[in-house]
Each structure stands twice: as structure tokens, then as C-alpha cells.
Amino acid sequence: MEFLLDIKANLMTYNTFTFKTEAQMLLFKRIWEDNGTELFDKLKKKGCTRFCLNQIWNVKGTFKMSVLFEYESPTSFKQCQNELENFTKNLMKELQAADLVIEESRNIVLQDLRI
């Protein structure tokens, strides 16, 4: 099967964070709530079109969150990486003791249906 992609196809990153305790997850949530808007303001100037912080709730007894970023183009993705690396560096300092597991994915949007 062959997929034809528009040159302007959106790129996205989707990262899942698994914590050992609810307290660690809530700290992570608070850090993003306190800093996410400011970070997105910087990223949107470089082509980030969406930021979404999520709490994963459907697996009982686990403490998981995820972060989604969407970008206009491969160039936008590359331009946002420095800002994200700086933010992540500071974030990881605060969460160093949390011993969290991060699962990262980079995606090309092939089909996106919306209302």
C-alpha cells in the first residue's frame, strides 16, 4: 500500500510518562500547568501548532500522563527542539527522584478527521 503525503503534512510528537506514585504524577502535572502556556508561546513562533497535556486514566493502579505536540513542517519540528530541550532539562532536574519511564514517539500525520 502506498501513502501519498502532502509536503506540508503535520508532524507530531507524543510522549508517555509513567510514574511510580500519584504524588510524582501530580508534581509533573503542576510543572506543566505552571509552564506549559509560556513554553507554547515560544514554540508557536517556531511553527508548533498544538500542545496537549493529558492524564491517562484507563489503566487502574498506574500513574501516567502524556504530552502531544504538533508541528507545521519538518523545519518547524527542528526549530522547536532547542526550546523543548531547555525546558526538559529544567523539568528533569525537578523530577530527578521520580524515576519515571518516558516513551517517546515521532509521528507523521497520515489521516486526521475532525468535526
Residue ranges and their predicted role:
Residues 4-9:
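Surface-exposed beta-loop interaction hotspot
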Residues 2-3, 15, 106-115:
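Short flexible/disordered coil segments
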Residues 10-19, 66:
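Active-site-flanking beta-strand signature of metal-NTP-handling nucleotidyl enzymes
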Residues 34-50, 60, 68-108, 115:
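An amphipathic, aromatic/His-enriched active-site/gating alpha helix that lines ligand/cofactor pockets
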